[in-house]
Every structure is written in structure tokens, then in C-alpha cells.
């Protein structure tokens, strides 16, 4: 199954978030209203947060009550949850 235009949009947002800061991961989510949120992983010596967790936190803190899609991009073959 090919991703639709809205799914391609969040994949592009996830790639852009990752590239912007040269992060290991980039993620984007779409909420029930169609709003999108993108984030890159944080990997500091004192703090590590996955890109997907950050994108979800951004959506929830902006008032999203449900998510309809998520995209995670990385060079890795596996991703830690």
C-alpha cells in the first residue's frame, strides 16, 4: 500500500526535523484535526528523548486528544522505544 499525500507530508516533516539538527531520529505526528507536529531526538549527556516521544508530547501539550498517524525516520535498522 502506497502512503497517501497526508502520510507523505508527515514523512517529509520527520525527515526535515532530523536533518535540521543532524539528529539520529526525526518524527512527526498528525492529530485528529489534521495538525502536524515534528521533532528530532534529543541526545545530551544528561537527557535522552526519542523523536516520537517529543512529537507526541508536543501534540498533547497543544491540546490534541488523539493521533491518527505517526512517522519515524532514522538511519538505524531498529529504533529503541
What do these predicted ranges mean?
Residues 1-20, 62-81:
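C-terminal binding/interaction regions
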Residues 6-9, 26, 47, 51:
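Residues at the start of alpha-helices and the adjacent loop-to-helix junctions
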Residues 21-25:
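Short, small/polar residue-rich loop motifs at catalytic or cofactor-binding pockets
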Residues 26-35:
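Short beta-strand scaffold segments in enzyme catalytic cores
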Residues 44-58:
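A short, polar/charged loop-to-alpha-helix boundary motif
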Amino acid at each position: 500500500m502506497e502512503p497517501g499525500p497526508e502520510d507523505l507530508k508527515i514523512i517529509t516533516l520527520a525527515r526535515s526535523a532530523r536533518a535540521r539538527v543532524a539528529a539520529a531520529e526525526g518524527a512527526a505526528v498528525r492529530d485528529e484535526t489534521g495538525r502536524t507536529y515534528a521533532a528530532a531526538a534529543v541526545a545530551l549527556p544528561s537527557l535522552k528523548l526519542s523523536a516520537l516521544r517529543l512529537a507526541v508530547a508536543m501534540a498533547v501539550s497543544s491540546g490534541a486528544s488523539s493521533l491518527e498517524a505517526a512517522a519515524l525516520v532514522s538511519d538505524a535498522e531498529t529504533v529503541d522505544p
